Amino acid sequence: MASNERDAISWYQKKIGAYDQQIWEKSIEQTQIKGFKNKPKKMGHIKPDLIDVDLIRGSTFAKAKPEIPWTSLTRKGLVRVVFFPLFSSWWIQVTSLRIFVWLLLLYLMQVTAVVLYLLMPIVSASEVLGPLCLMLLMGTVHCQIVSTQITRPSGNNGNRRRRKLRKTVNGDGSRDNGNNSPDKVRAVETLESASSVGGFWGTLFGNRIKRVKLVSNKGTETDNDSGCFHPILKKRQGRPEIRMWQAREKAKVSDGEKCRREAYRRLGNGISDDLSSEEDGEARTQMILLRRSVEGASSDNGYEVKNRRSILSRHLNSQVKKTTRWCHIVRDSDSLAESEFESAVFSQGSRSGMSGGSRSLNLSRRDSESTRHDSETEDMLWDDLLHGPECRSSVTSDSEGAHVNTIHSGTKRDPKEDVFQQNHLFWLQNSSPASERVSAIIWEGNECKKMDMSVLEISGIIMSRVNAYEQGVGYQMLGNAVTVGLALFPFLYRLFREKSFDQLKSISAEEVLTLFCGAPPVTPVVILSIINFIERLCLTWMFFFMMCVAERTYKQRFLFAKLFSHITSARKARKYEIPHFRLKKVENIKIWLSLRSYLKRRGPQRSVDVVVSSVFLLTLSIAFICCAQVLQGHKTFLNDAYNWEFLIWETALLLFLLRLASLGSETNKKYSNVSILLTEQINLYLKMEKKPNKKEQLTLVNNVLKLSTKLLKELDTPFRLYGLTMNPLIYNITRVVILSAVSGVISDLLGFNIRLWKIKS
């Protein structure tokens, strides 16, 4: 229905727009209809030394986002909570078995409490409805948090980000080994979460370990030594380039042929510098063909296949040395660092193009190439941090048709969208900031040493300092105290309302039980009261636990910003044991901006924002209810127990929101501290005075600093708590309603009119 309305609107829009057109507009439309397919084109590439505004804004380091609207997520969350046992597999997938059992017990107790209350409506309704509302709220919040995993294809494991591909690949009669029999290969990839990762690489690249296994038809299982098996290459198993890899594994060809078939062309970086001028034309053709294979071109004829095979056979030797260097890194890494290197290096199959058995290559150039190893490894690790997981998870096999049979365990994605993400990954690889280094100063005791460091290395040191910081437990204790108080509140309210201090000294156990139940202590009422107490205790603790997680995340963001602001200060950098460098070169400014954007995007983002948004909306809702109750009758407002409970909730939530608002504001100030750039400009002028011969170069850097200052002022916005700010309409409506209600309450209490918000006409 909605699509028909949109079509009708578009039709009528074009219809009435035709009456406004002149000859020039009609001719332009005809030109646009013809398109640009017939225009001459030539090869181009992205300038790797330039930056985009996305890098300054931070959108270069994209985070996972749900593809389902928030209304659908809210509806699904409510359904999954109401019919909790029916979605047991989903809850186990997104939590764990133990947590699911615990939640199932709470769900069954809540259902029992509702049934008992409907049979005997003796106790207060707020004691039953309070835990029920908390359960619905937290279930909806959790559904929105894990929504990025819901939209992606996943198996039984909730943490798995890749598809399980079951492929049937037919042999090619024109292959060199002459193997014409059909061949089936099943590739199963699993992701495991490491329990604890320490050190620089652990804090920088997360807790992911990748293992790849190849299972043949005979039931034997062979481990891929190097594991360089990219999902895009798996997707193209049926193509001649990938069949070469299968031929080597099964026919056991000679070592010389293995070396020739080990490496594939690297995509996204243009033509290798090692190629001679006579081979440039063929190398370009090879790059175009391989890129087409990655982007999903599935209409290759036999002639094109032959051309690909011949071109590959001519130039594979020139890539053996590069493959050797990558395999070197994998072999020489240690323990957990090795697995982290493998996870990052193997994920770059579309760029490095290594084949599965490349560990058998000659590794004789190890010492002379060690410096280049580090820089190339950082390039790939940086690219993996940018959009690697998203692009890997978006691989589909819609274009393979007869070659590949894929088991889709999730929703289908548009192949054009996948191609766009893959091309976007190539752009990021070409403009990787990790390839550039800055001469930084580090302190080892009382000694000051210089060291060339990249963005990854500097950020890794900063994150290790933040992880070593001892977090406070003040807000955890506050949450626990509020949890116990809210769980015991109905009993304490009845106790102090019906008994005086003198009567409390001689109170009996039967009277305590009666006050605890709020009714004569018969068996169903006692069971209902115990269930309500357990529900209130557990669910309230879970809610404040989520708030403590949000507070911890905001604290870590503040520490990231604090240490980042100390990088250009020699005294502060030495105090906190972080690298120090000055913005005396244009390259240093570029790295400083890249580091700033990278640190701003590190850690949980959307998931924590969902929690804060929900808390913000809950606080505003409670405030609106309290204002309405006061307007209805401020003299009898405190006579009801649920109004007291609302006030306790509002006070606790406001304390947490005040903490989050202060941390967020301080974090924003640290990142938007223009005084750092102004100080560096003063340092440049001081340097000009001492070195007049470098005045032109220093003036250039000074101009770049001025532009950076203007750009940061243009892009940075004041900090706002997530919630209503995400929807301007709801934000404005709520601001008017809440402030108008508060104005009415204050005016009623004080006796004269006070207008906190004026609606402008």
From Swiss-Prot:
Segments traversing the membrane: 77-97, 99-119, 121-141, 472-492, 514-534, 610-630, 644-664, 736-756
Composition skew (Low complexity), residue ranges: 170-181, 347-363
Residues modified by glycosylation: 179, 224, 362, 430, 673, 732
Phosphoserine: residues carrying this PTM: 272, 276-277, 333, 335
UniProt-annotated stretches for the region Disordered: 152-184, 345-414
Highest taxon, organism lineage: Eukaryota
The protein's name: Protein PHTF1
Gene (UniProt): Phtf1
